[in-house]
Amino acid sequence: MIRSPSDVPVRPDTAAGAVRPPRRWLPTGLVALVMSVTVLGGFVVAGTLPAPDVSPIALGGVLTIRPLPGWEVVRRESATVPSPSGTVISGEFAQLTRGSGALDLLALPGVGGTALELADLYAAEVLTSQLERISVSELVERIVLRNGREAVRFSYIGSEPRTGAAIEGSVTVVVAPSGNGAVFDGWAFQGQLQLIGGELVAMIESAEVA
């Protein structure tokens, strides 16, 4: 179980992110993780090209996020996550991609509890079912997003079952006062997580959880 010590500093700038093979949804409907990697391209002089207007994405009346220019929705579907009591929690899953990178989003209406409890559920029921040799950090960071919403963030490392590739990731979890929850899962092949950290943090920081 992941836990949150009182001496963990508040850091609203921690990164997330990377790329993994096509997502596998479990037959039971377990929400899947997919991940993200930034593709490094050429250089453009600041101000030369206007930034395109990107429309916000809304999930389940719970989560609203504005993709950065170049990111687009490539997958969107209903998802369920098993709860410790044996029931299932229904929500909506979406995947944003940019080149070979991706950011997974999970919106869970009325999940209740705390962000730490939802983070523990996600680690136990989703991450462990999708990765082999998974290792999740015992300590989580309590952070405050730019909009003032409190959240928790933890890291993990594991291997992709089909290829054995080492993967590292960072998960940010928010539960609003309404009881609605949101999970932002960013990942990359080991050693590449930092490449997309800035863009992932920017999108998460500007997201709204109703």
Language model regions located:
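N-terminal targeting sequences that direct proteins away from the cytosol to non-cytosolic compartments
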Residues: 1-97, 187-210
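Conserved polar/disulfide-associated segments of primarily extracytoplasmic proteins
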Residues: 3, 12-21, 25, 49, ...
